[in-house]
Amino acid sequence: MKVHCLSQSAQSPCFLLEYKNVKILLDCALEISSILHFLPKNLNYNNNNNNNNNNNNNNNNNNNNNNNNNSYSFKEKDKELNQFFKNINGTLYIDNGCSNIKYNCPQFEMIDDFSTIDMILISNYTNIYALPFITEYTNFQGKIYATEPTVQIGKLLLEELVQMDKQYSNSSINNNNNNNNLSDCWQNIEILEKLNVHNVGMENENLYRDSYRWKDLYKKIDIEKSFEKIQSIRFNESIKHYGFECIPSSSGYGLGSANWVIESKGFERVVYISDSSLSLSRYPTPFQLSPIDNPDVLILSKINHYPNNPPDQMLSELCSNIGSTLQQGGTVLIPSYSCGIILDLFEHLADYLNKVGLPYVPIYFVSSVSKAVLSYADIYSEWLNKSKQERAFMPETPFLHQDLMRKGQFQAYQHVHSNFQANDPCIIFTGHPSCRIGDITTLIKLYDNPKNSILLIEPDFDFKSTVLPFSKQISRIQFLPIDPRINFNEANLLISKLSPKHLIIPRIYKNYVKNKHSNGNFGIVTTILPLDTIKIQNNQNFESGFIDKELAQTIQTKVLDKSSQLKNNTTTTTTTTINNQQPIHVAEISGVLSMSDHELIISPPNISDSNKIIHIKEKFIWGTLSIENIIKAINSTKQFKNNGDSIEYFEINENYYLIKISSKNKTNNNNNSDQVTNIHLSPQNVNIETSCETTRRLISDIVLLNCNGFYV
């Protein structure tokens, strides 16, 4: 078994599992944080915006640059770099006027031929963003499996991203209408090499080292074609494919989010866990433990990015900040994804506003897919927790946002230009959480006021890199990541219950995650890095397969019970068991072993095959040896009698004998010499020590004829 890590980081999982000539791709997430390297649209920057004091020293003849000035040295040395990159407080950003957004895909270069990939298993809608790159831009022809909410909501989120990306691209074209020849030139290898030379020894040294492979986003038509190829499944539904059984179970993270069990015909069992939550108070179906119990191999990824910030604590701080901002007459902007933790927040915030006496404050949800997401959330009641399912059986919707809409406290808009008129103070949820694309960039400019707040709640984006381009903003910006995924302590508790024999984790989890079982034993832990390939030893001694129906009808089985008495197994005879042990059924089969769709099949041989089988037929011994019968057979053997051989028997201990046969050997010189054959005999084993091949064959035949079992 091999596991290839195509991921760029632990937060963008993509693994290739190779096992028994089957290749399974586990998730295909984009490294979405790469979007932070681009400047937001509709904002203008100068390289020296935040370095006026340093520029005043340019007239001095001091050539000793300090560390703060090193980050700006490329401006003086190479004006070409200044056309593509902007430096803000020592961090390089790609200018919003010279390029479209580029996206950091998994390391698909590790896969030589996508037609060899048998299937793709998707865990949730956050790990599906790279799927169109596979289905529409490679020769992939395999199967794709995901739960229905993952398919439907994932499609909405991808279409939303495409729309945001298109808006950014149009803005870049408008900003760069006089320099269209600069578009995407920053990815030129020579430009990046110059940048790396300038950044040696600095914080930005490796920032863009592999950015030459970043790609333009796919089109909406690609999403349509790609998602048509996905087969929707339900929790605990078994998929039997290529000799494997794949079963999804709830991970408790989001609508339809799943962990996967991949089992090889009852032998080795692989479990893949990504984006899981053990919380019982959230809206999704709770985490299911029993379906993923006792794995041989456990692949664990995408744990809580901020384990020191418990979700409940962050939620309390979020409400506190929202309350203080609203009481001062300010508006709260919350950049977020259009599905996920946001569904928890709508109801929680409405309840909080009522408690603090602010029920009149409206909550706005601005997204091109806002209404569709809210509709799906109500439709997929069977994918929700028990309390919300019970509401669905009543004449009520599972979520409260419909009630809030009727009260006028909650409103959904397609975008800020669709008759959106906010009544301040208010709370506005909109995308994108990176603050690089989407309506949030417009609203940040619109609400640039010290009484307003921008609260960043999504954990996927680094706070410093996110807010640096907005360093001139006077509104308050705070980072309150709400990450419901399991933290390291919960991961260790989960691992102790699952008791995996082999645990595979990203390298950054090495010091925090242990493979300690509930019984105190420790399992194997293997860490993996991007581009790594690890091999896992396969201890399986047998392989399951099928027998052709025609061949099966010709099989005549025989039974070996505990006492090894040979019995015929007929349709009218019932085989009894001894001491509650099942008897062993054995039979001789002559057939041809072949593989079809990764499944082994034994079929009847044709004429040419039959001739080959006769010549390569082997013998296999079953059962135990009858010491008494073997001794009698040796005594009655005519060859030993005719030669006058001496036969002696020594009982070493119970059921263990030494038989010594001495015979006269006449040489060419007519001198007689003794030839000794020693036979070590027990019910389970026989060793023949002799220099005479004729004697060895004779004794071997006697042993085979006196085996209390069945041999072929």
From Swiss-Prot:
UniProt-listed SMART domains: Beta-Casp (SM01027)
Subcellular location(s) of the protein: Nucleus; Cytoplasm
Taxonomic superkingdom: Eukaryota
UniProt record, GO biological process: RNA polymerase II transcription initiation surveillance; snRNA 3'-end processing
Pfam families (UniProt xref): Beta-Casp, Lactamase_B_6
Primary localization class, coarse: nucleus
Record SUPFAM superfamilies: Metallo-hydrolase/oxidoreductase
GO CC, one annotated term: cytoplasm
InterPro entries: Beta_Casp (IPR022712), Integrator_9su (IPR027074), Metallo-B-lactamas (IPR001279), RibonucZ/Hydroxyglut_hydro (IPR036866)
Keyword terms of this UniProt record: Cytoplasm, Nucleus
Record field: compositional bias (Low complexity): 47-70
Residue segments, region Disordered: 47-73
Quaternary assembly: Component of the Integrator complex. The core complex associates with protein phosphatase 2A subunits, to form the Integrator-PP2A (INTAC) complex.
Protein purpose: Component of the integrator complex, a multiprotein complex that terminates RNA polymerase II (Pol II) transcription in the promoter-proximal region of genes.
Family listed: Belongs to the metallo-beta-lactamase superfamily. RNA-metabolizing metallo-beta-lactamase-like family. INTS9 subfamily.
Protein name listed in UniProt: Integrator complex subunit 9 homolog
Organism: Dictyostelium discoideum
